[in-house]
Amino acid sequence: VLSDGVSNVVYACIRMGNSDRPVDNINAGGMYSPIDLETGKIACAACDKQRIVYERHPRSGCLLKGYQIPYWDKVMDICREAAHKVPQMGYIGWDVAITKDGPLFIEANNMPGHDAFPQMPLQAPDKIGILPVFQKYIKGL
C-alpha cells in the first residue's frame, strides 16, 4: 500500500503447487501460506481453496512453518521501490518469483488476493486475518 508517499507491505504469502500440475495458482489446486514480514519465514501451515490445512508440503514433505524464503530482504526492497513507480494505484499486489539468481517480478495486480486471502484466518496463529493491518493504511488512500 502506498500511503502518504510511503510504501508499506501489508502482507506476503507464498503460493505453492499441490498436485501433479506445475502451477501454484490457488484456483488450480495450489495452496498458500503467509510469510512473516520481518523474518521472511513461512509463518504457519498452508491452506488450499477447499480450506484444507497442510503442516507439510504434500509432495516434498517439507515442514512449511519456519521455512526461510531466499532473498527476502531483496524481495521487500524491490516491491517497495516498484510501488513508487505507479503511485496512482495505491494498493498493488506484486507476484515475485524466487530464482537461483534472486527475485524477479512476474506481474502486478490491482486486486490482489481477493479470492484467496479471506481464508487466511483459518491457519493464522491469531485467527484474526489481515483487516487490522489494512486499517492502518487505508485512510491515506
State what each model feature region is.
Residues 40-57, 61-62:
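Extracytoplasmic/periplasmic proteins that interact with beta-lactams or build/remodel peptidoglycan
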